[in-house]
Design a protein with these regions (language model features):
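Hydrophobic transmembrane alpha-helices and their immediate junctions
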Residues: 203, 208-213, 237-241, 245, ...
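A membrane-periplasm/extracellular boundary helix in multi-pass inner-membrane enzymes
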Residues: 148, 152-157, 227, 244-284, ...
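Long extracytoplasmic/lumenal interhelical loops at the membrane interface
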Residues: 280-294, 298, 306-350
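Helix-loop-helix junctions and helix-breaking kinks within/between transmembrane helices
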Residues: 1-6, 43-54, 101-109, 182-190, ...
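Aromatic-anchored transmembrane helix interface
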Residues: 54-56, 79-89, 100-123, 137-138, ...
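N-terminal signal-anchor transmembrane segment
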Residues: 1-68, 92-97, 392-394
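Transmembrane alpha-helices of multi-pass inner-membrane enzymes
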Residues: 61-65, 385-431
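Alpha-helical transmembrane segments of multi-pass inner-membrane proteins
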Residues: 89-92, 113, 133-165, 173, ...
Length: 431
């Protein structure tokens, strides 16, 4: 039996034990998700039945047992609920109009667990003033586990993994790009880049992180480089620049000095890191992606309103866009399941209306925080949660990351945290 199947089954069993032992509460579900984050993307159903992960399965179980928390929505969050229902409606219409109706309808199940997670996290933040610190602690521990995996892989090799085979991108020019507990080094890089900003977070004084915050941040930065992901590093840089601009205070000066010192050291040893060597091939990578993007955009134009149906890109490419492929080992043709760009993936599969609705859901809370900042309110803490979203947003241009629950979970967590700001749940930490 496949090792990942055993791990997935074990994770489900552990969830039921923990969940019922602690009283079937929403906090039990939320803490289990982050405590066992490395296992959350392991599959529990085949692709033909939605390809559900451990995260999906335990989210549906929790929604059934905690249905009152799901159904009761405060008026302040009604707009997000209506946007989500509108998004699901557009995806449903796209599935019905696609060439792969049954597959698309099953895959709609994949978009519901993130909503369940955010909904329950918002409820818990509202009810429990101490939950934020505990939840953030477990997220940071998950990041340390990812870093620990990389350290072990540096010592014993890439065979230290959950997976029977890894993505071919884990080696480049004979050098390793370390995937941690992911099967793909680029996914690992984006995860580490997003999570690194949480190490800078000092709830007691957002504008003055402690020395330990900078040390942990530096360790995470080194792990990003070992993962060898250009998109992750660029997203990391964008998030850091945003923090320097908007957080201000002593953080601005300290972060700039810290960044210059770390950058100088890394550049001095750049020949030792595969990431920096990969920038020399950036032009070739862009040329390849541009040809893929052009084909994907043509697919979008032909299916403008509702798209080709969720998770249908690979099947559609096989029939109608046969230039969307890679040559892998032994010159085997592998049709792409995403066009090397997350935004084009969503445009082609969700269509214009689904795409716009989804990004309204993601960006509305972010825009609201910037509005509060302009109005003179104290929202420094919120920018530490926006930075991972900015990081993800930029990396999404060259890497479709939302196929992995371990990226979805921190992204949804940050969205929930900044939605909480209008509810005045976290603003007290600014005072």
């Amino acid at each position: 039996m496949n090792f990942t199947i055993i791990l997935a089954g074990l994770a489900i069993i552990l969830f039921f034990i923990y969940f019922f032992y602690t009283g079937t509460t929403r906090s039990s579900y939320l803490l289990f998700v982050v405590m066992f984050l490395p296992l959350m993307d392991l599959g529990v159903t085949p692709a033909a039945f939605g390809g559900l992960s451990v995260f999906d399965a335990i989210s549906f179980v929790t929604a059934f047992l905690c249905y009152k928390d799901i159904l009761h929505v405060s008026r302040k969050n009604n707009a997000y609920l209506y946007l989500f229902l509108l998004f699901v409606t557009f995806i449903f219409l796209g599935s019905l109009s696609s060439e792969f109706v049954s597959k698309s309808l099953f895959n709609i199940l994949n978009i519901i667990p993130p909503f369940i997670f955010i909904r329950l996290l918002l409820k818990e933040l509202e009810a429990n003033d101490y939950f934020l610190k505990k939840f953030l602690l477990y997220l940071k521990i998950a990041c340390f586990v990812a870093i620990g995996f990389i350290v072990v892989q540096m010592v014993v090799g890439l065979n230290f993994t959950f997976y029977s085979s890894l993505n071919q991108n884990v080696t480049d020019g004979g050098k390793n790009r370390y995937p941690g507990f992911f099967g793909d080094s680029q996914m690992s890089g984006v995860f580490l880049a997003m999570m690194s900003f949480l190490f800078l977070l000092n709830l007691e004084n957002p504008k003055r992180p402690a020395i330990k915050n900078y040390i942990f941040f530096g360790i995470a930065m080194l792990a990003i480089i070992l993962a060898g992901s250009r998109s992750a590093l660029l997203g990391f840089g964008a998030g850091l620049i945003m923090l320097v601009i908007f957080v201000g205070g002593n953080f601005r000066v300290t972060a700039m000095v810290f960044g210059v010192l770390i950058g100088a050291v890394l550049l001095y040893f750049s020949d030792s890191f595969v990431l920096f060597q990969r920038f020399s091939t950036l032009d070739d990578s862009i040329d390849f992606r541009a040809s893929i993007w052009e084909g994907a955009y043509d697919i979008f134009k032909k299916n403008f309103a509702f798209g080709i149906g969720i998770n249908n890109y690979q099947d559609y490419a096989k029939l109608h866009s046969q230039d969307q492929f890679l040559l892998v080992d032994n010159d085997e043709i592998l049709f792409l399941d995403a066009p090397e760009n997350g935004y084009l993936k969503f445009l082609t599969e969700f269509g214009f209306f689904g795409f716009v609705t989804l990004f309204l859901l993601i960006l509305s809370p972010v825009i609201n925080v910037f509005y509060q900042f302009i109005m003179g309110k104290k929202v420094s803490l919120a920018f530490y949660f926006i930075a991972p979203i900015v990081c993800w947003f930029l990396s999404f241009t060259s890497l479709y990351t939302l196929s992995d629950s371990r990226i979805i979970i921190p992204l949804c967590s940050c969205i929930a945290f900044i939605i909480a700001y209008p509810l005045n749940l976290l603003v007290k930490h600014e005072e």
